[in-house]
Amino acid sequence: MVHPYLFLNFFRELLHPLGFSEAGADAVVYTWLIMIGLVVLSIAATKRLQAVPSGLQNFMEVIVGGIENMLVETMGEHGKPFFPLVATLALFILVSNLIGLVPGFFPPTANINTTAACAVVVFVTTHIVGVKHHGAGYIKHFLGPIAWLAPMMFFIEVIGHLSRVISLTLRLFGNMNGHELVLIIFFGLAPFIVPLPMMLMGVLVSFIQAFVFMLLAMIYIQGSLEHAH
């Protein structure tokens, strides 16, 4: 699903020979735009660090500090090594959600490939961390406490872990894509006044979806660190 008109529309023509659809090309372009923007923002915020923060540094410290506090409350102090991953995902998803509210911009999270990529990152990280922390004993997470039920529990647990990828992917994609559809319909009916309440709702949805994805990522990683019972 794409906007009626798009900023940086000419990139479609560049990516079309590579086999990208219009929606896929838009997602790639805006994903790179957001990543570059976040890098520039981080450089600008840390270029002249001050003991008493102000301006952009203060704004970014509030955001980053909030994410770090939530991570510590959810995972404990041993969760701090995962802060870069969690914060990066949270900021990328939040900005990706919000950028769709700007007329002519496409939110990458309204493309299922983007949300699937984020979900796979969480899935792979979860199990790499589990294996690294527990070694071969990580398999106990999939076997359950009763030995004779282990084969069945293993199958159930594998399905459960794979379903995490599907749920993370579809929850974010469904909410953002659905919101995009509603916005386009309202913009078609009344371009200036009617969409405003939906845009305000979109801001709320954008924050909630980024928060939920970040929280679930922390919970899944924390689960892989715990000892199996």
UniProtKB/Swiss-Prot annotation:
<keyword id="KW-0375">Hydrogen ion transport</keyword>
<dbReference type="GO" id="GO:0045259">
    <property type="term" value="C:proton-transporting ATP synthase complex"/>
</dbReference>
<feature type="transmembrane region" description="Helical">
    <location>
        <begin position="181"/>
        <end position="201"/>
    </location>
</feature>
<keyword id="KW-1003">Cell membrane</keyword>
<dbReference type="GO" id="GO:0005886">
    <property type="term" value="C:plasma membrane"/>
</dbReference>
<keyword id="KW-0472">Membrane</keyword>
<comment type="subunit">
    <text>F-type ATPases have 2 components, CF(1) - the catalytic core - and CF(0) - the membrane proton channel. CF(1) has five subunits: alpha(3), beta(3), gamma(1), delta(1), epsilon(1). CF(0) has three main subunits: a(1), b(2) and c(9-12). The alpha and beta chains form an alternating ring which encloses part of the gamma chain. CF(1) is attached to CF(0) by a central stalk formed by the gamma and epsilon chains, while a peripheral stalk is formed by the delta and b chains.</text>
</comment>
<feature type="transmembrane region" description="Helical">
    <location>
        <begin position="104"/>
        <end position="124"/>
    </location>
</feature>
<protein>
    <recommendedName>
        <fullName>ATP synthase subunit a</fullName>
    </recommendedName>
</protein>
<feature type="transmembrane region" description="Helical">
    <location>
        <begin position="142"/>
        <end position="162"/>
    </location>
</feature>
<dbReference type="InterPro" id="IPR023011">
    <property type="entry name" value="ATP_synth_F0_asu_AS"/>
</dbReference>
<dbReference type="GO" id="GO:0042777">
    <property type="term" value="P:proton motive force-driven plasma membrane ATP synthesis"/>
</dbReference>
<keyword id="KW-0066">ATP synthesis</keyword>
<comment type="similarity">
    <text>Belongs to the ATPase A chain family.</text>
</comment>
<dbReference type="InterPro" id="IPR000568">
    <property type="entry name" value="ATP_synth_F0_asu"/>
</dbReference>
<dbReference type="Pfam" id="PF00119">
    <property type="entry name" value="ATP-synt_A"/>
</dbReference>
<keyword id="KW-0406">Ion transport</keyword>
<keyword id="KW-1133">Transmembrane helix</keyword>
<dbReference type="InterPro" id="IPR045082">
    <property type="entry name" value="ATP_syn_F0_a_bact/chloroplast"/>
</dbReference>
<dbReference type="InterPro" id="IPR035908">
    <property type="entry name" value="F0_ATP_A_sf"/>
</dbReference>
<keyword id="KW-0813">Transport</keyword>
<feature type="transmembrane region" description="Helical">
    <location>
        <begin position="202"/>
        <end position="222"/>
    </location>
</feature>
<keyword id="KW-0997">Cell inner membrane</keyword>
<dbReference type="GO" id="GO:0046933">
    <property type="term" value="F:proton-transporting ATP synthase activity, rotational mechanism"/>
</dbReference>
<keyword id="KW-0138">CF(0)</keyword>
<keyword id="KW-0812">Transmembrane</keyword>
<feature type="transmembrane region" description="Helical">
    <location>
        <begin position="25"/>
        <end position="45"/>
    </location>
</feature>
<comment type="function">
    <text>Key component of the proton channel; it plays a direct role in the translocation of protons across the membrane.</text>
</comment>
<feature type="transmembrane region" description="Helical">
    <location>
        <begin position="82"/>
        <end position="102"/>
    </location>
</feature>
